[in-house]
Amino acid sequence: MSHEAAIVQTTNHLTMITLRTAKPSDIPQLVELLKELFTIEADFDFDEDKQARGLNLLLKSEKDCILVAELLSDNRVLGMCAVQTLISTAEGGAVGLLEDLIVAADFRHQGIGAKLLVEAVNWAECQGLKRLQLLADKNNLPALNFYQKQGWNSTQLVCLRKC
C-alpha cells in the first residue's frame, strides 16, 4: 500500500492524515483503539494482552493487513481496520473478512472511517479477493448505518459462535 495523504474537514480546521499499513510500533495505539471499540461491541471483552497478541499475529501475516489513519501533525493513530484472508468454497477462492474498523471518538464523522474502508477495499482488490464481508454488532446502529451508506448490504446469514 502506498502512503496516501488526505485532508479531512473537522469542525473548526483541516486535519491532515495519512493512510498506511500498520507497523509494530503502532500496537500500543491500536490496542487503545480496540479498547474503545470493545466498549461498543457486546460480544467482546477488552484484554490488553490478547489484543496485542492478535495484532502482532496480523502484522506478521503476509496475507492479512492492518490499515491505519495517522494524524500527520503528531503521528497519532486516529483509526484502524484489519482485513483477514479466508478461503470461500462458495466463491472458489480467497475472500476477506474486514474487522476492527474504529476511529477515535473525537475524530468521527469527518470521513476518516470512509477513507479507511475505501483503502481496505482497494487492498482486497489488489490481493485478488473475490468478496469482502464484515460482522457488526446488531445494536450498533451508527455503525450499521455507516456501512449501508458506504454501499455494504445485509445478508441472510446469521453469525453463530462457540467459545
State each model region's role.
Residues R76, A114, K138-Q156, K162:
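Conserved active-site alpha-helix within GNAT-family acetyltransferase domains
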Residues L86, A104, D137:
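Residue-level recognition of the GNAT/N-acetyltransferase active site
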Residues V103, H109-N122, K149:
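Conserved acetyl-CoA-binding loop-helix of GNAT-fold acetyltransferases
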Residues A124-L135:
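Conserved GNAT acetyl-CoA-binding A-motif
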Residues I17, T21-I27, E32-G93, E99, ...:
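Acetyl-CoA-dependent GNAT
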Residues M1-S25:
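Conserved N-terminal entry element of GNAT/NAT acetyltransferase domains
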